[in-house]
């Protein structure tokens, strides 16, 4: 496994995302299979696990918590996210955070993100009336969050405005980064902007949920002409 240093941590370059998990014929999460995947990942050096409130119809955190509970707490780093992008009623960060800790069966999160700060929810995240960011900054002070960051699919003006206001509080940012989104979602410009704020970048969707590993044959043939030994997935890996 390849590792990268983040502050005083040694993180696996490959993380274990749980937005998509194996399911049974009736659509439930196949927990035995998921457990085997988690065990295999840890045994082979993966130590970063990413979940979120909304993943797998709000069940990902619960299943991930059960799977990781079987391993020593200091053998993995766990990240989850506050669902500001899906709120349909008044925000209650304290209640949501308490539920997340219960579902994940932990007393702290190694990494905690504001989920998808973008044009449609940035006002919720930043409104002093709700105090969302202030609440999580306080949880970090109390040790219940070790590192606070955010994920985003925002356009550049929105991202710029958010960083101007809260960049000092954000320790890392997760963006969609692959050779397609380098231009499609302006990942290049987002990387440049985040670098100006000295904010480390986390990569999500490096192969776009597998789509960049399963290209049409015509596209695969073109890539094969340039690098016969390379798979479609390896192109995504080397350009992300």
Listing of model-derived features with the role each one plays in the protein:
Residues 1-76, 135, 141:
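N-terminal binding-site loop/beta-alpha segment at the start of enzyme catalytic domains
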Residues 74-86, 112-115, 175:
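A short, structured active-site edge motif that brings together acidic residues
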Residues 117-240:
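Beta/alpha (TIM)-barrel catalytic core signal, keyed to glycine-rich beta->alpha loops juxtaposed to Asp/Glu
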Residues 28-41, 89-105, 154-165, 232-237:
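Short, acidic/polar
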